[in-house]
Amino acid sequence: MIWSKLSSSINYYINKRIWGEELLKENILLLNQYIEDAFILEDGIYKYLDKKTYEYIDLSEEDMKKIEEAFIERLEKKRKVNKDKENFKNHMIMITEYLENEKSKEKSNVIELKNYRK
């Protein structure tokens, strides 16, 4: 039960707070920022605030390791998706430029009959 809440928290954080230049930062810096933003450290134990019950839930070391692994895995996935999107965008720009160039070549070969009317 707790893992589904933590997993949702990781997804939300990565999708809403990490984009653009943030993706260029090191994994550990982004992970530490997430942990600082999402959890409270009290007496050496991380606590997660359940948004429905407004109760703090103690997290074990195992939970924290699982959070770290999931966060980094999802961050890498987002970087790959963004890279793929950027490659696709660049490819589409090249195609558009090529088509515009071909269209302008085609126009230069067209004879305008209206110019020859008396």
Swiss-Prot record:
Superkingdom assignment: Bacteria
Q: Which UniProt keywords apply?
A: Plasmid
Q: Any idea what this protein is called?
A: Putative uncharacterized protein ORF9
